[in-house]
Design a protein with these regions (language model features):
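N-terminal capping/small domains of soluble enzymes
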Residues: 1-106
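Non-globular sequence segments
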Residues: 90, 94, 98, 104-128
Length: 128
């Protein structure tokens, strides 16, 4: 059995994490209204890598504007988000850790006040 301090290689990519310690995806609601990362969120996640985690996972990140599930959720759907995402990945990788994004779509739970559109679902659901 592998120890938590053992390296871990992802077979498909060949990337190697320095250890098996993983920051789980946690909702911290620190992103800006347009889905861009705030300095606070970048700093918080980067500090996990600096502290020795081998893999740092982001909070849920919506892949389309209408998939946002709550206030403060980061997005990965627009070019305007790339500078912050690049800064985050670079900061994590500089400490030898691997960065992972938890992709997400809020489905029928997306608040219309955030998305501006009626929520979508894979099946017919009652809204009341």
């Amino acid at each position: 059995m592998a120890a938590p301090t053992d390296t871990f290689e992802f077979p498909r990519t060949g990337k190697t994490a320095p250890n098996r310690a993983v920051v789980a995806a946690m909702t911290n609601k620190q992103s800006n209204e347009d889905g861009t990362l705030s300095d606070e969120e970048i700093n918080w996640l980067t500090r996990r890598a600096e502290g020795g985690f081998g893999i740092v996972t982001t909070a849920a990140t919506h892949v389309v504007p209408e998939g946002q599930g709550w206030d403060g959720e980061m997005g990965v759907w627009g070019d305007h988000q790339l500078p912050g995402l690049t800064r985050l990945a670079t900061g994590i990788n500089e400490h030898g850790a691997i960065s992972l994004a938890q992709i997400f779509h809020g489905g029928m739970r997306c608040p219309q006040r955030l998305t501006g559109v009626q929520p979508v679902s894979a099946s017919i659901n009652s809204t009341g």
